[in-house]
Amino acid sequence: MRAAGTRAEGVLLAPYTTLRLGGPAKAFAEADTAHELVRLVAEADRAGEPVLVLGGGSNLVVADEGFDGLVVRVAATGVSVVADGDRMLVTAEAGEDWDALVRRCVTEGWSGVECLSGIPGLVGSTPIQNVGAYGQDVSQTIAGVRS
């Protein structure tokens, strides 16, 4: 395992996609914090290097030729919970596994996302894709998104 934020060359992307497809990235890095993600993307932008921000790798097909630029995998994790009267405010980092978060909410008895179990991906991509199933979608429960 490489240190967060350090670049590696030629990392195969197949292990990072749910379809297990994908050739090498010209450069690959993992961002363990939002600050690290911003830094890596900003550096690549300044250098004119193409950037792919990678979450859980679902809904993503990478060619056998790979990606001719920097792939930054979102790896920031952490969940905090604050009670607000009879409501719970759950804050999750973008790199948290979505289904694991749903399982925790169900286990704790927090309603609102229970129908969204089994959907692959990370927390950070769920609002972008407006994940939904069985008449429930994340737009009904998200109070805010930090970008």
Positions of predicted regions on the chain:
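Anion-binding (especially nucleotide phosphate/pyrophosphate-binding) glycine-rich loop
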Residues: 1-147
